[in-house]
Amino acid sequence: MRTLCAVIAGVIGLGVGVSGAGAAPSGREAPVVDQADLIGASLQVGETVFGKFLASRYAESVGDFAAAASFAAQLMAENPDLKDIARRGHMLMASAGRIAEAAELAEQVVAGNERDPLANMTLTARAFAREDYREALKRLDKIELTGIQRIIVPLMRAWALAGDGRTDAALVLLEDLTATNALLGPITGLHGGLIADLSGRPEAADAAFTRGIAASGESVSLQMVEAYAGLLARSNQHEKAVRLVEAFTLTNPRTLLIEPVRTALAEGKVPEPVVTGFADGAAESLHAVANQLYRERLRAQALIMIQLALHLRPESPATLFLLGQILEREEQLETAMEAYGGIDTSTPYGWYARLNLADGYRTQDHLDKAVRLLRAMIRERPERSDAARALGDFLRIDERYREAVSAYDTAFERSADAADWRLFYTRGIALERAKKWERAERDLLKALELEPDQPLVLNYLGYSWIEQGHNLDRAKKMIEKAVLQRPQDGYIADSLGWALYRLGNYPEAVINLERAVALEPGDPIINDHLGDAYWLAGRREEARFQWTRSLSQEPEPKVEDIIRDKLKGKQLPQPVPAKQRRDI
């Protein structure tokens, strides 16, 4: 929920107990490893253990928690008394989804530090799985309410109280939580309604859901709509449930996720409940917090929370989908694809998971597999445009431009949104590359009409006009506008330099093309452009150097032939006639 995101941004002290003091150079959260751990490992057990320790650390540093956990398991099996290995091993096992093993290690951790937040949260999840709600409450009592724990602990405590038969106490706890921070109204309303509904108190559930919706403003969550619509349908308020779902659909017209509820109501049935037990409620709490940690780019913490949620609801499509998203961001594509592959394809999340699987196949250079999957999806749901659009993107990137145009045409036929500049832009690119300029120009102009200041459109259309020698003054102004918006984009800088070159302003062209090469040093076209500008600026040796450099960067065969001719003194750049030159 939007409001929960705002709250988390304000209270996070990285209090899950697994965050580092800073970020790794790549932007990924740095793994938590004290230097003393490393030195201690070396001194205590020698090089074999040291190697496994380093292997575990390296796997963790690149986000491969499964491998890191395996190395840590070997290390612990051989050296159970190694200093602090239980804490590290517990974190890695939880990150890898090996919750049973993580819980065993958590027992060791709390034996040395009974207030360790992550270990106690893992043991709380295990207690919920065992329906031991008093044990869950005991573990939650040990967690200090700092950072994100100020949200997740009260939510989990409410569910444990409800599981222990203390529904009134659970609902009061959630009301008190709202009183401390009104922005938590949506999530406390949702969970209060779920607890009351599950405990057989429909009137209290209705009141809680109503408060939650009021607190949500225009950002009512899917879970809220699903849960409240189900309650209304069971309470013989079918029409009110339908209106609730219709209102959500109006503000979220493209989503499939509401489809099961909408279909059930259309058939006069009661939608499936959001939760069927108290462990489900705990999982829902963990999932909500994991989702917002992920949005805040705190992926290491999000991964542990979602793995705990998955332990409580192993086949949850929503949980598996979020797990896949987090793993993708951690560059663990194969593991992410396993998560996506575990989602029932008949569910709405199964549709989105297959879109992500197709993208994964493309990334793995299995484009044919991605294309087959997307074509099957296009046939499966003839009313949807997203699979056709993805197919167009994949084919365009693979330079299969005519096929890409066909896929984009299908997407347009199915799209309810005629004001999507991105679709006009991407089809315009494919059309231009397929040498269908008239259609391409119409699409690019339409994209520009819809998004007048969009730098990508300004640059592409402007560059295309320059290449054709059309509308040069307007093209230059468009590209200058794009440069102002994206000054660090080497391709846009190249477009401006090339525009100046085509206008005969070689000194200014050189300045801008040198900047473009500095931003994108490995692009053969930009280096070739700079070579041409150097040549006409009278800097012949530098021109030859740039052309030679361009050849080393494996340009397309046609471009390569032109560059080789220039190096042989053939087809050399020719200056623009003086009468056609324009000042900047």
Task: List where the protein language model places each region.
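N-terminal leader/linker segments that initiate helical-solenoid repeat arrays
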Residues: A21-G89, S95-E104, E114-L118, K138, ...
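Residue-level recognition of tetratricopeptide repeat
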Residues: R57, M91, A125, W159, ...
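TPR alpha-solenoid repeat register
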Residues: I85, A119, V153, I187-T188, ...
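Register position in tetratricopeptide repeats
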Residues: S61, S95, A129-R130, G163-D164, ...
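Structural marker of alpha-solenoid helical repeat scaffolds
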Residues: E78, A111-N113, L145-T146, A179-N181, ...
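Canonical tetratricopeptide repeat
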Residues: R88-G89, T122, M156, H191, ...
